[in-house]
């Protein structure tokens, strides 16, 4: 090795001297000049000695050409490999160092790749339409969420929840007690329907809020929270979006041809699909919340929207039961106090009575001839979350107990070796039917109606069905 080193050094010196002599410059003694001359020699070796040598004849010229051509090829190949070698070494050092975190951009690219791969894999399933149906309505609504709403352009946006946040299933703080069914008392159906119809009038046509969602938003905005009401409301919306994702999982698991395809996916791909579903539902809920907070259809009469046909072919809102007169004219629904209309000689008076309750709600208008008993808003809206309100204080309800009889495990504590993802106080896995939970509980005071996403309709029998979450665990100690 030492002999080869001296040979290479001598060759570099000779070549550099010849190049410098031809160009009329002498080699400089400082390091900077030496580096420049060395670089010039390395770059010119591959071309200078491949042509015929000048002033050299016979075998000596042939020998020089062969030696220098081989040497020049080796040097050039080494130069080309140096950047790649440095890059490989840099990558290895990053992998070895556990404290070095992957940049956010790299994570984003990786997640996008997995999401695209998951979508491509799921589309190959025989019954992919079942999964597609579960997300179709929410996906259509999401397309307009990033643009201003046509029906909610005006209004106070100080209470809006911004939708520029992407949620992740891995970061769930899951409270499964919030999965109990939403119920509405039969005696209050008319009141809920009127508010719901008014809410539909002020919403974009692609949002399509349900009765239960309308009741949920009304109770949420009337819930008196002393500190940070917006952040508390945001958490409730996130929990509801999580509920919708689990209902989608439940529907997919009950489709025998889809679930085996789902179980074939890796956990990474499953989380990508669930992240997609979670954000679709969350963005839709945020849009509904902001419109409801601005318009307050539970307090203010809704303007007529001719684009939405809610009562026959009249194009009027079902929330405002205003009769036409003989000329077919309709009084503006926000007329104060009395709105009178004449039809066939008979005169009807619609009196708008606004009675403020103790918790700030307003009762619905009623005809004076029919004195219907209207309860306060505390009993009007259904129990939607785990806590109930009493005045200005929140009273937490008891945690519902989940039974896993007949199943191998449900809500089991963490055990070493389990292939699950650990969150703050929950575990999320995909073990299929061997883990199940019955999140619904029957209410003695209310008739049960299962809450479902806008794209899914559940019957009362679904309330009694055990909901298998595909291995999503949580147990309170």
Curated annotation (Swiss-Prot):
Residues making up the signal peptide according to the UniProt record: 1-20
Positions of region (Disordered): 326-345, 351-370, 376-401, 433-455
Keywords attached to this entry: Host nucleus, Secreted, Signal, Virulence
Domain of life: Eukaryota
GO cellular-component term (any): host cell nucleus
Annotated motif RxLR-dEER, positions: 48-65
Subcellular location: Secreted; Host nucleus
Family (UniProt): Belongs to the RxLR effector family.
Domain comment as written in the entry: The RxLR-dEER motif acts to carry the protein into the host cell cytoplasm through binding to cell surface phosphatidylinositol-3-phosphate.
Role played: Secreted effector that acts as an elicitor that induces cell death in host plant cells.
Name of the protein this chain belongs to: Secreted RxLR effector protein 102
Organism: Plasmopara viticola (Downy mildew of grapevine)
Organism phylogeny: Eukaryota, Sar, Stramenopiles, Oomycota, Peronosporales
Gene coding for it: RXLR102
């Amino acid at each position: 090795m030492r002999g080869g080193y001296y040979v290479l050094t001598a060759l570099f010196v000779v070549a550099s001297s010849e190049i410098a002599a031809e160009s009329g410059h002498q080699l400089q003694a400082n390091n900077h000049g030496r580096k420049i001359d060395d670089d010039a020699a390395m770059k010119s070796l591959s071309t200078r000695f491949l042509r015929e040598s000048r002033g050299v004849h016979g075998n000596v010229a042939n020998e020089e050409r062969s030696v220098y051509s081989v040497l020049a090829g080796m040097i050039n190949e080494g130069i080309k490999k140096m950047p790649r070698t440095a890059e490989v070494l840099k990558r290895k050092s990053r992998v070895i160092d556990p404290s070095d975190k992957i940049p956010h951009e790299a994570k984003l690219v990786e997640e996008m790749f997995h999401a695209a791969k998951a979508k491509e894999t799921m589309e190959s399933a025989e019954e992919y339409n079942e999964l597609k149906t579960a997300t179709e309505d929410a996906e259509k609504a999401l397309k307009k969420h990033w643009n201003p709403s046509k029906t909610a352009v005006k209004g106070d946006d100080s209470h809006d929840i911004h939708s520029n946040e992407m949620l992740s299933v891995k970061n769930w703080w899951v409270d499964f007690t919030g999965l109990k069914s939403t119920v509405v008392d039969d005696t209050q159906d008319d009141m809920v329907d009127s508010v719901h119809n008014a809410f539909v009038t002020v919403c974009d046509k692609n949002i399509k809020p349900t009765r239960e969602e309308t009741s949920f938003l009304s109770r949420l905005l009337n819930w008196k929270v002393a500190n940070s009401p917006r952040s508390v409301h945001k958490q409730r919306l996130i929990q509801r979006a999580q509920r919708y994702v689990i209902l989608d999982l439940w529907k997919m698991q009950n489709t025998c041809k889809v679930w085996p395809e789902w179980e074939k996916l890796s956990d990474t791909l499953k989380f990508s699909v669930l992240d997609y579903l979670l954000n679709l539902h969350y963005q839709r809920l945020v849009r509904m919340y902001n419109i409801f907070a601005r318009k307050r259809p539970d307090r203010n009469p809704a303007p007529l929207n001719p684009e939405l046909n809610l009562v026959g072919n009249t194009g009027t809102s079902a929330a405002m039961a205003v009769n036409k007169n003989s000329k077919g004219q309709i009084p503006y629904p926000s007329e104060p106090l009395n709105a009178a209309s004449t039809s066939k000689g008979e005169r009807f008076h619609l009196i708008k009575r606004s009675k403020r309750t103790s918790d700030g709600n307003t009762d619905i208008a009623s005809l004076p001839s029919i004195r219907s008993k209207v309860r306060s808003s505390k009993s009007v809206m259904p129990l939607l979350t785990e806590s109930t309100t009493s005045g200005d204080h929140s009273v937490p309800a008891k945690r519902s107990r989940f039974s896993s009889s007949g199943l191998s495990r449900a809500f089991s504590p963490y055990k070493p070796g389990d292939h699950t993802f650990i969150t703050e106080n929950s575990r999320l896995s995909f073990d299929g039917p061997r883990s199940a939970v019955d999140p619904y509980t029957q209410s003695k005071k209310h008739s049960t109606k299962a809450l479902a996403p806008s794209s899914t309709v559940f019957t009362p029998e679904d309330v009694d069905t055990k909901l298998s979450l595909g291995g999503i665990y949580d147990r309170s100690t």
